[in-house]
Amino acid sequence: MARKSLIQRERKRQKLEQKYHLIRRSSKKEISEVPSLSDKWEIHGKLQSPPRNSAPTRLHRRCFSTGRPRANYRDFGLSGHILREMFNACLLPGATRSSW
């Protein structure tokens, strides 16, 4: 189980990313449309003004039940450990274990 503070920090990053998403997207679009290099540098400086934690690359996918940041399956939103436990308990319909 992940510490509560780490999960809260991740939620804070998600909120910041949603808040500054439009600003980042519009700045990137402006950079691609402006032909002069000096204007591009100006817009690039504006792109660096939002908080660092508002960048989408700072986000991690976390397990829905445990908060584990690694080995997550996107389709289920769970870590591999919990996913295997749910497979074994037949809690995920349509999922079968491999056997050969």
Curated annotation (Swiss-Prot):
Keywords: Chloroplast, Plastid, Ribonucleoprotein, Ribosomal protein, RNA-binding, rRNA-binding. It is found in: Plastid, Chloroplast. InterPro entries: Ribosomal_uS14, Ribosomal_uS14_bac/plastid, Ribosomal_uS14_CS. The keyword Secreted does not apply. Its main location: plastid. Disulfide bonds: none annotated. The keyword Ribonucleoprotein applies. GO terms for molecular function: rRNA binding; structural constituent of ribosome. GO terms for cellular component: chloroplast; small ribosomal subunit. One of its GO terms (biological process) is translation. Part of the 30S ribosomal subunit. NCBIfam families: PRK08881.1. Binds 16S rRNA, required for the assembly of 30S particles. Belongs to the universal ribosomal protein uS14 family. This is Small ribosomal subunit protein uS14c.
